[in-house]
């Protein structure tokens, strides 16, 4: 009886695995058809945010690494800015506990920053502190 049960269990498992290999091609919807018939364009949130910031660093959705282009801001001040958000306005950064030197640096580069609404896809976990890009 044990042998029959183990044989049936194995056969059922193999049938399930084979079905899993065969079905995905017919189960998944074609992305072109989804976009065409749903009336919605398939969009990537990250690409939308990059387009919205117009070459500037988004204080609510950028990682610490984006501040490397501004001498003196990376990593200490950049970390404070990233952890201090979200912001409604660029000037809200001045409400953080910044030294006089850091305030001068921020004002020097202020025109290079923008604020857009925080997006969970870009802020989930600790990706803004360590986005996993290594040299």
Curated annotation (Swiss-Prot):
Keywords: Electron transport, Membrane, Photosynthesis, Photosystem II, Signal, Thylakoid, Transport
UniProt subcellular location: Cellular thylakoid membrane
Membrane protein topology class: Peripheral membrane protein
GO biological process: photosynthesis; photosystem II stabilization
InterPro entries recorded: PSII_PsbU (IPR010527)
Homology family: Belongs to the PsbU family.
NCBIfam families: PRK02515.1
Name listed for the protein in its UniProt record: Photosystem II extrinsic protein U
Taxonomic source organism: Parasynechococcus marenigrum (strain WH8102)
Gene from which the chain derives: psbU
């Amino acid at each position: 009886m044990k042998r029959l049960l183990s044989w049936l269990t194995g056969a059922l498992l193999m049938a399930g695995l084979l079905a899993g290999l065969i079905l995905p091609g017919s189960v998944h919807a074609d992305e072109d058809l989804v976009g065409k018939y749903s009336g919605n364009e398939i969009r990537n949130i990250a690409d939308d945010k990059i387009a919205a910031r117009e070459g500037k660093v988004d204080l609510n959705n950028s990682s610490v690494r984006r501040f490397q282009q501004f001498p003196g801001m990376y990593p200490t001040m950049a970390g404070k800015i990233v952890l201090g958000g979200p912001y409604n306005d660029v000037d809200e950064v001045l409400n953080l506990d910044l030294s006089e030197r850091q305030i001068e640096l921020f004002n020097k580069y202020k025109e290079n920053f923008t604020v857009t609404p925080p997006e969970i896809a870009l802020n989930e976990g600790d990706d803004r502190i360590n986005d996993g890009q290594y040299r």
